[in-house]
Amino acid sequence: MKKLFFLLLLLFLIYLGYDYVNEALFSQEKVEFQNYDQNPKEHLENSGTSENTQEKTITEEQVYQGNLLLINSKYPVRQESVKSDIVNLSKHDELINGYGLLDSNIYMSKEIAQKFSEMVNDAVKGGVSHFIINSGYRDFDEQSVLYQEMGAEYALPAGYSEHNSGLSLDVGSSLTKMERAPEGKWIEENAWKYGFILRYPEDKTELTGIQYEPWHIRYVGLPHSAIMKEKNFVLEEYMDYLKEEKTISVSVNGEKYEIFYYPVTKNTTIHVPTNLRYEISGNNIDGVIVTVFPGSTHTNSRR
């Protein structure tokens, strides 16, 4: 009897230890900001890094390409804005890792499917393991049919849904509705660590124009998801924040990122680093955002 008691006690302590380690890991997530009252060029010159920068010409088309596009009733998706790596997930077993599909016609950006799989695998390690993808990318024709069948109360016209961009997906739980499921709570608390945001939170319906959708997540990438989580921003607020601040330095878990906003009219010249990785994304309105990543790898991309 004593042996059984000690065995149960040992198992209980192991459980507590695991839970404590998980809590400790999550509590270490840290976001620190530094804003600069100057334009991007001045910041680069004053920081002594201007010799490591080069000029780059940005065209108006780039305003409508990237992971940070604001898509809503005012700013629709353009056909050229759609992610170029859309695939049928049911034909890519390597991308379906840790979650299920509602049916065999779920399409997604390959890049974002990989990010989602990484996130879900970490959730599974913590005991949250009943994720399914109910909807991913929809082309404009499919969106038009959905709008005609469902009406304005339940669907958006073609071009006005984030699903038309390839940047968003609807996530469900095989247990219950997302507002009650462990999967829904986990996403709300942790998705930002993997570059995802809950696009339509319950307390921001007046800003987004969309009712609360605990299942709809959107990829924006780090450090943007971390900033939005820390400041309780939806994408509409974040775009305004970037335009107002113009230059932001942020540390996420000790990794320093720099973010620059540039307004774009016709062909605009901006400054980018020559020795650091960076990404350029449009905002789908009137400018581009340059994100400079930690490290010294000289690669860049236009998302």
Curated annotation (Swiss-Prot):
Gene Ontology BP terms: cell wall organization; peptidoglycan biosynthetic process; proteolysis; regulation of cell shape
Cell wall biogenesis/degradation listed as a keyword: yes
Record's keyword annotation contains Cell wall biogenesis/degradation: yes
Annotated positions binding Zn(2+): 163, 170, 216
Active site: 213 (proton donor/acceptor)
Organism domain of life: Bacteria
Keyword tags: Carboxypeptidase, Cell membrane, Cell shape, Cell wall biogenesis/degradation, Hydrolase, Membrane, Metal-binding, Peptidoglycan synthesis, Plasmid, Protease, Transmembrane, Transmembrane helix, Zinc
Entry's Gene Ontology cellular component terms: plasma membrane
Biological role stated in the UniProt entry: Cleaves the C-terminal D-alanine residue of UDP-muramyl-pentapeptide (UDP-MurNAc-L-Ala-D-Glu-mDAP-D-Ala-D-Ala) or diacetyl-L-Lys-D-Ala-D-Ala. However the physiological substrate likely contains L-Lys instead of mDAP at the third position of the pentapeptide. Also releases the C-terminal D-lactate from UDP-MurNAc-L-Ala-D-Glu-mDAP-D-Ala-D-lactate, a depsipeptide produced by the vancomycin resistance protein VanA. Therefore, VanY should contribute in vivo to the hydrolysis of both the D-alanyl-D-alanine- and the depsipeptide-containing peptidoglycan precursors.
Protein family: Belongs to the peptidase M15B family.
Protein's recorded name: D-alanyl-D-alanine carboxypeptidase
UniProt source species: Enterococcus faecium
Gene: vanY
